[in-house]
Amino acid sequence: MWISLCIGFLGLCSVLIGSCILFLHWKKNLQREERAQQWVEVMRAATFTYSPLLYWINKRRYHGMNVAINTGPPPAVTKTEPEDQNSDSLWELDLSEGRNFVVQDSSPRGEASDLLQHVLGIPKQPQSSKMSQPRTDSPFPLPIFQEVPFALSLCHLPPMLNHSVSYPLANRPERNVPFCSLPTLAHGTNCFNAKPFALEL
């Protein structure tokens, strides 16, 4: 008799647990459908337009740069001399923050551009000409862009070398190294000649 009672109690517990699991799944699916319906209503009611300028401004503000849309010169209002000095100090502070941000952001690009200028033989431009920024009467700092260094056109580059990439210099060295394919190397054939390779080094 005790065995039958234990079996009945275990069966009742399993039924209760199964019903609770089914109820939780039903409630979860119901909440998911409600959220999906709310999202559909929001998507139908709102109009989403992609604005590159707004994306650019939000990205700069996220990184700590004070940037806004410059709608033109402010209306002519008589200002006293202390107000003009305060606006000039705020302008210089914002401009210095923007310049610091640009310098920190473009430090790896500057190293890459210096290396490219050294390889291509282009004279390096002074930093003062790049970072020069005219002052205006706008209270918002103007964005500063780094110009890409001049690169040679692809039509002036030398032709493709045998089994190699195109050489970026005008005077390409003469290479006399034989090409070894993977099947040749798999067979263990040493196709490299030590003498021409040593001459290149």
From Swiss-Prot:
Pfam families: THEG4
Location in the cell: Membrane
Domain of life: Eukaryota
Membrane topology field: Single-pass membrane protein
Bilayer-crossing regions: 3-23
UniProtKB keywords: Membrane, Transmembrane, Transmembrane helix
One GO CC annotation: membrane
Protein name: Testis-expressed protein 38
